[in-house]
Structure formats: structure tokens, C-alpha cells
Amino acid sequence: MASVSALTEELDSITSELHAVEIQIQELTERQQELIQKKKVLTKKIKQCLEDSDAGASNEYDSSPAAWNKEDFPWSGKVKDILQNVFKLEKFRPLQLETINVTMAGKEVFLVMPTGGGKSLCYQLPALCSDGFTLVICPLISLMEDQLMVLKQLGISATMLNASSSKEHVKWVHAEMVNKNSELKLIYVTPEKIAKSKMFMSRLEKAYEARRFTRIAVDEVHCCSQWGHDFRPDYKALGILKRQFPNASLIGLTATATNHVLTDAQKILCIEKCFTFTASFNRPNLYYEVRQKPSNTEDFIEDIVKLINGRYKGQSGIIYCFSQKDSEQVTVSLQNLGIHAGAYHANLEPEDKTTVHRKWSANEIQVVVATVAFGMGIDKPDVRFVIHHSMSKSMENYYQESGRAGRDDMKADCILYYGFGDIFRISSMVVMENVGQQKLYEMVSYCQNISKCRRVLMAQHFDEVWNSEACNKMCDNCCKDSAFERKNITEYCRDLIKILKQAEELNEKLTPLKLIDSWMGKGAAKLRVAGVVAPTLPREDLEKIIAHFLIQQYLKEDYSFTAYATISYLKIGPKANLLNNEAHAITMQVTKSTQNSFRAESSQTCHSEQGDKKMEEKNSGNFQKKAANMLQQSGSKNTGAKKRKIDDA
């Protein structure tokens, strides 16, 4: 008869296996829900196509873009005249004319269009073709300031109201809202103005009764939905506008929204029937690239300066940073090396923001080093590069920010520097957001991918089907001619879990930095585990492996909140129990190599001309001299600083 200990051991094994099966069932259930959702989307699209092709369909309610791509409406002559003589444009971009015709017909419409596609024109031009004024709701004051600057240059009467508006200005705007002879065409407000100002709502009612309030434009309409990447609670109050002013047509605009987000936004805005026009996410002139972020700040700045002085010599660009502090520090570093750069962030004085924007627009400043506060509504067509000093907090944000390059349809580069530490800096910021961590991990997955077309990865996120061949080698992954293989990294995961278990027993919390140090046999001796052999891989490879385990849920983040900061720690994740099954394997794609090593493919570009390299080499000497002088000057201040690798530039 079997002993109790043997039976107990078998029972424990079965229990562990059952737990693993439960996790697998959960994963399959999640996948099932994804497929069901995609099936619904495709079914809806097929139904829409069939309805659009129905010969008996009424043109008044025909939601196909083709039905509205005409110039025989009563307002068409005026629209064309204003396009050419006020906005100084010869023709419309895709879906602009269709959207303008729908809103001119007094109907509700949502427009999903890539950043740089010309969404703003779709409510600005109709405002000039209509009596009265259009109310524009924007999420950021900086966005309103950007738009007003452009409108002023075009000679269009527009203004904004916010918390810092003077009493005299508020009084003037309120008077203009009901003045039948007023030339004021666009009034910009934040959603807080609608939610919290009874005085303003009262004035809107009087303007509506006087038939002066004709249209509502909700910019960044994805902010309505809690499932959107930038949910704002005050956007939920905007439903009052259609309830109180049903005859004022509404137009909602966004660069990034899934079908789920748009449906949610439609309910929140109290819209019964709504046209939805969606342009393809693809910007064929943009080249996407992910680079490993150098761990040394000086090396990092050197890499950026070589790009600016080489490939982008004399060309305009944006560098996006994670924080205001990063923005200012990078700006100073670039200026010290001869780059004409200006910082831009939310805490700048309005006049300073305007100065930076104006100088950049006039090419007096080559590079704006900015936080996310810069960009919405930016309409500089000749931006040749957008560099991300740190990755964005979501795919939607990255798509929107990188999309500010190449609005003139000429080739432009979108280069993202991916660093392990940025994961946890951003995670600590988005932890309180509804789906903040999930969206961040999608961004990490994009950065970690070394083989799949960048456009395919984006298309999957935005519910589109994309053939990688259509990329035309306009991303780093499509340019690679390396072979790839799946590397078994299961034992690495087992070792990390041993380290984390020991830390738990000692009542210790491990930050990502401490976990790597312990794994490498460094740091506090008590955190090292007997039997865990330090891997021989470079630190950046170990970081990629840990990031892989994190997004695959073998590890998870835990947070500690202090009065001054949110600290991220790593703990054992929900899928770690799968490792109780000896047959369970975790693999990771790596570049195939003849050497017995784990190496992720380094970033490379293939669309740049040989002249780029020559230009970089030509400017490299000047850069090295400047860098050497800087080091010489700072040497006495920081004798322990690491010597910059100038010879490797």
C-alpha cells in the first residue's frame, strides 16, 4: 500500500497541474473573447457594406464616404472658395470633404483620422461657411493656444475661454455670442468650462435661442470613454450639449479610437445616429524604428546629436521626453553642443510657450524638446524627425506623437529609444488609470518585437488588417535580413522566481534594479540564492528577458506609495505556477547567431541614403571636439564621471 507521503506528493502534483490548467483555460477564454469581438467588428463592417451597396438606400442617410464626396451641394461653392482663399489650400485630403459635407448638412459625424491628416479643417472651414459660431471643446489649453495662433495668421476670428481669462475678455466673449453682427466664428473651451460654469451654459442657451450657436466640435473625442487612452472625467459632462441644444450639429474628432471607444463616446455625448468615417492608420511616408536606449546619458545625447548634425542637418524635428525635468536637461545638453533647441512643457509661461512655438515654426529653432503637452494641433508640415527620448505610455499616444512628422507627405523618421528603466517610471505614473498598465505593456511588447513589421503591430492594435509587404521597408524590422530563432529561457524564469521567493521570506521587496543585481550575483549578499548561477549575458539582454516575463505575466509589478513618489517592485506573477510542470517552456525570439549567445537585433535603418552616413561622419569630428571640450571643463567638477567613448562615435 502506498505511503501517505507518496499520496500527498501525488495530490500536490495534481493540485499544481489543475491550477496550471485553470490558467490555460483563462488564457483561452480571453482569446475567445478577443475573437468574438473581432467577429462582431467584421460582421458589422460586412453589414455596413451591404447597406451601402443597396440601390434603394436614401442618399440622406447614406453613411458611405462616397455618397458625400461630391461638390454639388448648396454650400459647395462657398466651401471651395474658403479652402483656397482663406486656408490657402488647393485640394482636400482624404475624408475631409466628406466630413465637411456631413456636418454642413446638420448631421452628427465622428472622424477618425491619423495625426497630420487635417482633422481641424473639418470644423474650422464649416464654421466660416455657417452663420453664428462653432463651440470647440479641447482637452488642453496648449492645444487651444496652438490652434488660435494658426487661425490668427489666417485672419480668422477665434478666441478661447479658460480659468485664466480676464473678466473683461469673458464679458466681451459673452457679448459676441449673442451679437448678430459678430465676426467671431470659433470659441475654444476646455470640457471643465461646460461641466462647471453655469454662467457660460446660460450664455450658450441665449446664443442658441438667437440661432447664433450652430455647431459643436469635440476634439480628441476618445477622451469621453474610460476605455480610451486619455480618459478625462469632465468629458462625461458633454452629453448635456446635445440634450440642451439638439439642433446644433456635433462633430467628434480623434486620431486614435477603436470601435468600442467610439460606441462608448456616442452614448456619452447623447447621439442617437452618427456617421463614422475612418481613415487608414497608415502613414506611408513615415519610417518607424526602435533603438536600444544607451544606459549612459552622455552616450545617449551623443547618439541624438549625431543624428541631428548628420541625417537631419538643418531639418526640423521634435524630441519627446517623459518629464518636464528630462525636457529641460536634454535641451541644455543639446544647446551646449551647438544644437538650436527649445524646451516646451505644461509649466512654461504662456508667452514662453508661444515664443518657442513661433521660433520653431519659423525655423529659428531646429528642435523642440517637449513633453506630451506639445503637439496636439501642431501643423508644421516639414517635420523630418520625431525622436522619443522615452517610449510613450500607450500605442495610441505613440501613434499620435510620432504622427507629427512628415505632414507634407515627404519621408520622415520616427525613432523611439527603448529603455528598461522607462517601463517602471511610466508604470508608476499610470498605475491609477483604468487600463494604464495594460496599455503600457502593449507599448513594451511593440518595443521588444525584433521581427514583425511595425505597421502590422500598429494595425493589430487599431483593429485593421495589414499586409507587411505594403510597408515597403519603411520600418526597421522589415529592413532586417537577419534570421531569427526561439530561445528557451525557462530556466532564467525559474532562477528569478527563486530569488523573489527568498526575498519574500526575508520580507524584502525587490525593485527591478535590485532583482537584476541579485541575478547577476551583485548587491546585498542576503538577496543572492545558492544554486542560481549568474548569467553571462550583457545586462541589456537580461533587462529584455525580465521585460518579456513581465508582459507574459510570469512576473508582476507591485507598488508602494509614499508622500513623494510611487515605487515599483517586482513580484512572482500569476503564470509562474505553470513552471511547476517540468514540461512547460518559455521561449523568446532572438536573432540567430553562430555564436552561443543571446543577442537581440540592434536597430538599423535601410531607407536613408549613403549621404546620411557621410554627413554623420563629416559632423562627427566637430561633435567629438565639442564633447571633449565639455568633458575637459566638467572634469574638475566630476572626477568620477565615466569617460565618454568619443573614439567609438
Curated annotation (Swiss-Prot):
Principal place of residence: nucleus
InterPro entries, sorted: DEAD/DEAH_box_helicase_dom, DNA_helicase_ATP-dep_RecQ, Helicase_ATP-bd, Helicase_C-like, P-loop_NTPase, RecQ_Zn-bd, WH-like_DNA-bd_sf
Residues in the signal sequence: none
Organism of origin: Homo sapiens
Role noted for this protein: DNA helicase that plays a role in DNA damage repair and genome stability. Exhibits a Mg(2+)- and ATP-dependent DNA-helicase activity that unwinds single- and double-stranded DNA in a 3'-5' direction. Full-length protein unwinds forked DNA substrates, resolves Holliday junctions, and has DNA strand annealing activity. Plays a role in restoring regressed replication forks. Required to restart stalled replication forks induced by abortive topoisomerase 1 and 2 lesions. Does not unwind G-quadruplex DNA. May play a role in the repair of DNA that is damaged by ultraviolet light or other mutagens.
Name listed for the protein in its UniProt record: ATP-dependent DNA helicase Q1
Keyword DNA damage recorded: no
Disulfide bond keyword on record: no
Tissue and organ expression note: High expression in heart, lung, skeletal muscle and kidney, low expression in brain.
GO annotation, cellular component aspect: chromosome; cytoplasm; membrane; nucleoplasm; nucleus
Binding site for Zn(2+): 453, 471, 475, 478
One example GO MF annotation: ATP binding
NCBIfam families given in the database record: recQ_fam
Location of the motif DEVH box: 219-222
Key words of the record: Acetylation, ATP-binding, Disease variant, DNA-binding, Helicase, Hydrolase, Isomerase, Metal-binding, Nucleotide-binding, Nucleus, Phosphoprotein, Zinc
